[in-house]
Every structure is written in structure tokens, then in C-alpha cells.
Swiss-Prot record:
SUPFAM superfamilies: Nucleotidylyl transferase. Substrate binds at residues 9, 41, 73, 87. This is Phosphopantetheine adenylyltransferase. It comes from the Bacteria. Pathway: Cofactor biosynthesis; coenzyme A biosynthesis; CoA from (R)-pantothenate: step 4/5. It comes from Carboxydothermus hydrogenoformans (strain ATCC BAA-161 / DSM 6008 / Z-2901). Homohexamer.
Length: 162
């Protein structure tokens, strides 16, 4: 069985993430979308809220599992018997950091592969940070995030959208 892990903070999941997830799910028997708990980041949404948004957004994909983990991604892959890390790229500027992380992961666990997927051009400008800022100021989120996530952002900031 070909198993891949798509790790991220998903604070919140965007349509850019969803694009990568949908395409990766077609390439693997099982795709684990895993929230990486990063003590260096202060997320807007709690871990449970982010898991809920992922579960709701991805509930119709039979080969996708939702999970969370702490520690090194490569250790999580070993625990899940996964062979591949999926990483999404919005622009060439994302590549340098992602490439260095892929090399580090390969050094730690030589059999781990990293596959980079370019997001569709229509999503290349979307980031979780930008989405949170748009939501905070009551801007229109249509086309940026799944509907359920838009609802949760509106609740969090108590702002109306478009």
C-alpha cells in the first residue's frame, strides 16, 4: 500500500491546501493529512478546531485520514508506515525552504521521499495568514477557503463577509 503524509498547521485549511490534498489523494492508496503541533507557533484555532475543519472539509474522501502529531515528521511517517511526504508549493520562493527540509528529512531517514506539488495558479496567492487577515477585517473569503472554514472564521472574528 502506498501511503503519503501531508503535514501542515492548517490554521486554517485553504482552497490551496484542498487543491494539493485532492491531487495527492489520487496518487496514493492512503493520504494522511496531519496537523503538525508546533510549539513555536501560536495558532488562531485550537488543535481540535483545526481537526474539525479538516474532518468536515474532507469527509467525502474515502482514502484520506485526518490526524495530528508532535515531533519530527519523519518519525511520524515511520509510525504510520508511510513512505512519502507531500509538500505544496505556491511559488518558486517556497521551494528553497521546502527543498532544504526535504534534504534534512532524507538525511534523517534515507528511504523517505518528498513529493512537491504545485498548487493551481488560481490558488498561488492564498496563504492561511492572508486568509486570517481578510477574515479579521470582514473581507470576502469566497474562493479562498471551503464554506465550513469560512463559517468558522466568521464565528471566530464575529465579522460578516460578502
Amino acid at each position: 500500500m502506498r501511503i503519503a503524509v501531508y503535514p501542515g498547521s492548517f490554521d486554517p485549511i485553504t482552497n490551496g491546501h484542498l487543491d494539493i490534498i485532492e491531487r495527492a489523494a489520487e496518487l496514493f492508496d492512503r493520504l494522511i493529512v496531519a496537523i503538525a503541533k508546533n510549539p513555536m507557533k501560536k495558532p488562531l484555532f485550537t488543535l481540535e478546531e483545526r481537526l474539525d475543519m479538516l474532518r468536515e472539509t474532507l469527509k467525502y474522501y474515502p482514502n484520506i485520514e485526518i490526524d495530528s502529531f508532535e515531533g519530527l515528521t519523519v518519525n511520524y511517517l515511520k509510525a504510520k508506515n508511510a513512505q512519502v511526504i507531500i509538500r505544496g508549493l505556491r511559488a518558486i520562493s517556497d521551494f528553497e525552504n521546502e527543498f532544504m527540509m526535504a534534504l534534512t528529512n532524507k538525511k534523517l531517514v534515507p528511504w523517505v521521499e518528498t513529493i512537491f506539488l504545485m498548487t493551481k495558479a488560481e490558488y498561488s496567492f492564498i496563504s492561511s495568514s492572508a486568509v486570517k487577515e481578510v477574515a479579521m477585517y470582514g473581507g470576502c473569503l469566497k474562493g479562498l477557503v471551503p464554506e465550513y472554514v469560512e463559517l468558522k472564521l466568521r464565528e471566530k472574528f464575529q465579522k460578516e463577509g460578502c
